[in-house]
């Protein structure tokens, strides 16, 4: 097997092992055995488990980051369409790369690999914040709240994606529909004045209760 092919084989084998057993539970021996090679072959290509793990994480980061960035930069798309596209980009990745998503969501190295799931979410939050800031100004809402809402929307989709990975009873389309329904209708119906219940539990606007 040529060097590049062997490298790709080891990356694929390692991705499955890391997704199944985690970083700490996976050894070079495990990876070599799965790939049917000797341990020195793994060390030759990656220098050890840490180097191989870094390559696996970096590949997944780039794949997911590119998909979501392209979705959120779709030209001439309105706010609702961008919510749909961003949501579907994440769910598409989870569906097609479940092993990669498992690795990213429990990545132990943080910034050491040149990127992580957290860095992807931070970039998404920034992009959503910019979009919401313009929308809030147009609707007469306080633009200073845009960062909070960007965090909330991004977290909602991200956490639901992690839940869906382990609870696939709903289809991807159903999950996306529910997420966009909640996100869009919640944002679309934001009021300029909203108050929490008082200490006695009385609602400021009971007519809007469920």
Segments and roles (model prediction):
Residues 1-5, 76, 143, 191-210:
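N-terminal intrinsically disordered/low-complexity leader segments
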Residues 6-14, 31, 56-68, 128:
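Generic hydrophobic, amphipathic alpha-helix propensity
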Residues 9, 13, 17-51, 55:
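Helix-turn-helix
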Residues 20-24, 75, 97, 139:
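Short coil/turn segments at alpha/beta junctions that flank glycine-rich nucleotide-binding fingerprints
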Residues 26, 30, 53-60, 67, ...:
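Alpha-helical DNA-contacting segments of helix-turn-helix folds
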Residues 55, 70-96:
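Hydrophobic alpha-helical connector segments
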Residues 62-66, 85, 113-137, 147-152, ...:
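Amphipathic alpha-helical packing segments from all-alpha helical-bundle domains
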Residues 93-115, 129-133, 159-166, 195-196:
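Amphipathic alpha-helical segments used for helix-helix packing
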């Amino acid at each position: 097997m040529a060097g590049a092919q062997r490298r790709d084989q080891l990356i694929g084998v390692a991705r499955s092992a890391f997704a199944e057993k985690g970083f700490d539970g996976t050894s070079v021996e495990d990876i070599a055995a799965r790939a049917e090679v000797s341990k020195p072959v793994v060390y030759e290509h990656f220098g050890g488990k840490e180097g191989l793990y870094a390559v696996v994480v970096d590949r997944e980061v780039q794949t997911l980051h590119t998909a979501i960035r392209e979705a959120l930069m779709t030209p001439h798309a309105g706010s609702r369409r961008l919510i749909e596209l961003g949501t579907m980009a994440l769910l598409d990745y989870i569906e097609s790369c479940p092993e990669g998503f498992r690795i990213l969501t429990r990545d132990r190295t943080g910034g050491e690999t040149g990127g992580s799931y957290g860095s992807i979410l931070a970039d998404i939050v920034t992009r959503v914040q910019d979009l919401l800031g313009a929308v809030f100004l147009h609707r007469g809402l306080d633009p200073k709240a845009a960062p909070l809402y960007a965090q909330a929307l991004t977290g909602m989709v991200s956490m639901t994606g992690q839940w869906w990975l382990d609870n696939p009873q709903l289809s991807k389309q159903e999950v996306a529909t529910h997420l966009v329904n909640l996100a869009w209708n919640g944002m679309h119906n934001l009021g300029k004045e909203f108050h929490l219940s008082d200490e006695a539990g009385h609602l400021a606007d009971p007519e809007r209760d469920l």
